[in-house]
Amino acid sequence: MKARSPACAALAISLLPGAVRAEIVAPAFEVDARDLVRRVVRSQRRAEAAFDDATFDQHEVKIDWGSDGRAKEIASRLFYVLSGNGDAEGSRELVEVDGRPATEAEKRKAAEEDEKDRKKRLVEKGVAEARRAEKVSGDEDDPIVGRKRLSELIGRFVIRVVGEEVVEGRPAYVLDFAPDPAAPAPKSLGDRALNALSGRALIDAVDFQVRSVVAHLTKPVKAAGGLAVNVKAAEIAYTGQPLGENLWFPCTVELRLTGKTALFFRLDTSFRIEFANLKRFRVDAESDVRPAGNPGSAP
């Protein structure tokens, strides 16, 4: 598992709790939105290499909401994650479940689920690579993001830099994105979701990293599979944290889904993932970049 920002993070932000916000003003000079996205992707790729063989905590919380708006069921898990090196897959170990130490059976089940997901990702990656044309000299300017070329991803959106603001003393570009009516017809669930995604991103103007993202679906998206789901609404939020030395680390990712299952059961579920206690290792040296006062759960 890599300590990397979501691929769609290169496309959005704002309105997050605790953010120190200022009035949005027009950019001092014209900024090309697509060039800005490309620069962000290049910057994030360079930064990702700094997190090879890093460790961090990943806290996941899932909440099923009742029709009265109250939490009906809450489940939490804490993982200790070892990031992979380069393109290699990392690994993670289940540490806690609902605030108590995980049992051996729970650890085995989590490991089996991760292995199943890993194999699925490898198969999907292989299929995508088999369909992909050979790399050309322009790959640095049109890299692969996830399983698609950057140009294909941003070609699905109308992207605009709508202003600038200062957040925590740092300048940032405010970038809005919305589905492009002329986007290619979707071929997969991922394409259908992208073709319905709209939101705002805040891009740090110094390091060209994604400070935060807020996005939502503009229309329902049907997902087939083991249990078909009709997602009528989805809200997504992401925040990043500057660490210094041009490095940023994901802080939180939040997702809420509402809709119906194939059996017409009500769906209203939220997910929150928090990342903390990052440690970077270099040969015999260890760098602890946790925020002050956070003791962490990792040994």
Short names for language-model regions:
Residues 8-18:
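Bacterial N-terminal signal peptides
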Residues 23-197, 206-211, 216-234, 240-251, ...:
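Structured extracytoplasmic
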Residues 1-9:
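Bacterial N-terminal signal peptides that target proteins for export
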Residues 201-202:
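A residue-level detector for well-ordered beta-strand positions
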